[in-house]
Swiss-Prot record:
Gene3D superfamilies: 2.20.25.30. This is Large ribosomal subunit protein eL43z. The gene is RPL37AB. It comes from Arabidopsis thaliana (Mouse-ear cress). The lineage of its organism: Eukaryota, Viridiplantae, Streptophyta, Embryophyta, Tracheophyta. The keyword Cell inner membrane does not apply. The keyword Zinc applies. Keywords: Metal-binding, Ribonucleoprotein, Ribosomal protein, Zinc, Zinc-finger. One of its GO terms (biological process) is translation.
């Protein structure tokens, strides 16, 4: 194991290689991909990444397709809000 500092955290494994700005970008991605996310089906924070783009809930067992590093991509959030807005317009 290499020696890690508190500041580097998850990207401490890269040491001084690849440059500071690239390590900052990688840190953002790796932190988000290892986070636990909220499950819409069972209501718990137990969704973790299985492989690239596939997210699974440990409690209820539901599997959902999402982004590579985050469960919801920016375009998916936009589409969801647009669908919700159109649905509200047709109901009223």
């Amino acid at each position: 194991m290499t020696k890690r500092t508190k500041k580097a955290r998850i990207v401490g494994k890269y040491g001084t290689r690849y440059g500071a700005s690239l390590r900052k970008q990688i840190k953002k991605m790796e932190v988000s991909q290892h986070n636990k996310y909220f499950c819409e089906f069972c209501g718990k924070y137990s969704v973790k990444r299985k492989v690239v783009g596939i997210w699974g809930c440990k409690d209820c067992g539901k599997v959902k397709a999402g982004g590579a590093y985050t469960m919801n991509t920016a375009s998916a959030v936009t589409v969801r809000s647009t669908i919700r807005r159109l649905r509200e317009q047709t109901e009223s």
